[in-house]
Curated annotation (Swiss-Prot):
Organism ancestry: Eukaryota, Fungi, Dikarya, Ascomycota, Pezizomycotina
Alphabetized UniProt keyword annotations: Cell wall, Lipid-binding, Secreted, Signal
UniProt function note: Constitutive protein of the cell wall. Antigen target of host humoral immune response.
Gene: MP1
Biotechnology: applications noted: May be useful for serodiagnosis in patients with aspergilloma or invasive aspergillosis.
Listed Low complexity bias regions: 176-234
Species name: Aspergillus fumigatus (Neosartorya fumigata)
GO cellular component term of the entry, any: fungal-type cell wall
Locations listed in the record: Secreted, Cell wall
PANTHER family: CELL WALL SERINE-THREONINE-RICH GALACTOMANNOPROTEIN MP1 (AFU_ORTHOLOGUE AFUA_4G03240)
Gene Ontology MF: a single term: lipid binding
Designated name of the protein: Cell wall mannoprotein 1
Length: 284
């Protein structure tokens, strides 16, 4: 009985003396985990984008930047990282680097679709914001690790910023595409038409008869030369010129017996003379 009680007492004493293991994760590790989750959300949004409204991608990018900036504050306000803490960051940072590279490659492959939606400039600005946030986080973590590991920490984080810089370079030429369509298509059209026509006509009429019949001569000539030149240009200028010349000449010549009155008078005079001559001849 006493022996059993002693064992129980020893057991309780041993249990109380054994330290309880409490899981302690460095704040920086939790920060990387949160950033990784939000990077996955951005990757999903980019993967689903096939043109049109890019708001889902923009929203995911803004949340990622917000998460990174929040992580920067957490690391800065947290304790210094031990060697074990720094080494614990190696694998998560490497995994995050691969995620970021995948998102950037997907963004680059869909550049034409974002530009077509006039969102190239938006993606460009989002990438710059991601770069600034990631660089701030890298500096914050490097400042917390032991000095002997600061170079290693910088090299690990450099992979993330290098991937983002690749995206920035790819979208740099689309920086001006920010939701407004711009197109320029100069066109110049020139047409020249020249039409020249010349018409010349001469008409001559001649009529001749005995002296008691009127004689008339008529001649006429006409010449017309229209010229038209038109040069239309898309800019809105045009010129035209036209000219025409016409000449007509007519002349009529009539002898002294060209009228009916003169012919009648001459006829009467001749008839009267003949009658008188006949009367004299009969009288003789």
């Amino acid at each position: 009985m006493r022996f059993s009680a002693l064992l129980v007492t020893l057991g309780l004493t041993g249990a109380l003396a054994t330290p309880t293991l409490v899981s302690r994760e460095a704040p920086a590790v939790g920060v990387i985990s949160d950033i990784s989750a939000q990077t996955s959300a951005l990757a999903s949004a980019v993967s689903s984008y096939n043109g049109g409204d890019p708001s889902a991608v923009k929203s995911a990018s803004e949340k990622l930047v917000s998460t990174i900036n929040s992580g920067v504050d957490t690391v800065k306000s947290g304790p210094a990282l031990s060697t074990a803490d720094a080494l614990a960051l190696t694998s998560p940072v490497q995994d995050l680097t691969k995620q970021v590279e995948g998102v950037i490659d997907d963004l680059i492959s869909k550049k034409d679709k974002f530009v077509a939606a006039n969102a190239g400039g938006t993606v460009y600005e989002d990438l710059k914001a991601q770069y600034t946030a990631a660089d701030s986080l890298a500096k914050a973590i490097s400042a917390k690790v032991p000095e002997s590991l600061s170079d290693i920490a910088a090299q690990l984080s450099a992979g993330i910023t290098a991937a983002i810089q690749k995206g920035i370079d790819a979208y740099k030429d689309a920086a001006s595409s920010t939701g407004t369509a711009s197109s320029s298509a100069p066109a110049t059209e020139t047409a020249t038409a020249t039409e020249t026509s010349t018409a010349t006509g001469t008409v001559t009429e001649t009529a001749t008869s005995t002296p008691v019949i009127p004689t008339g001569t008529a001649s006429g000539s006409a010449s017309a030369t229209p010229s038209t030149t038109a040069t239309p240009t898309t800019g809105g200028s045009g010129s035209g010129s036209g000219s025409s010349t016409g000449t007509a000449t007519a002349s009529t010549s009539t002898n002294l017996l060209s009228t009916g009155a003169a012919s009648k008078e001459h006829f009467s005079y001749s008839l009267g003379g003949a009658v008188v001559a006949a009367a004299i001849a009969v009288a003789l």
